[in-house]
Amino acid sequence: PDGVEDGHWRHNKGKKDLNRDWGFFTQPETKAVEVELEKFDSTDQLILFLDFHSTFYNRFYIQHESEMSKLPNFTKTWLSRSKELLEDYQFSVDPRLSENNGVSKNYIFTKFKVPAITYEVGDETDRELVKQSSITFAQELMKILLE
């Protein structure tokens, strides 16, 4: 975000964490995305949402199993197939109930009922492993979507 210039790694110049503004849309950056999302209709559908971040560990935040999406087995299938191919890339999966807390994945899931996943890469993860795992995750994702 533009707040990085002032030392605010998670905030924009308005001192707002943009990943806590979804559904509220008080900032110009998230408001612009809301306007684009409103254009989706029955002929131009959103089917999946991935939100990329970095943090301490390789982790995927996903919907809780009690929350059904339009692609009910997508996330579980995608991550399990990928894990089989990624012997050297360790990651955890953290199911969470969707709350109205301004987080993008929760907003998207609640509004569109599509798999909405936060994809976290560890800050200290070897960059070559990140690159190779990203290729695997992308390939497995596309295979499932095309089945």
Positions of PLM-derived features:
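Active-site-adjacent mobile loop/cap segments within catalytic or ligand-binding domains
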Residues: 19, 60-63, 68-69, 94-147
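Active-site/substrate-binding loop(s) of hydrolase catalytic cores
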Residues: 1-84, 88-92, 116-118
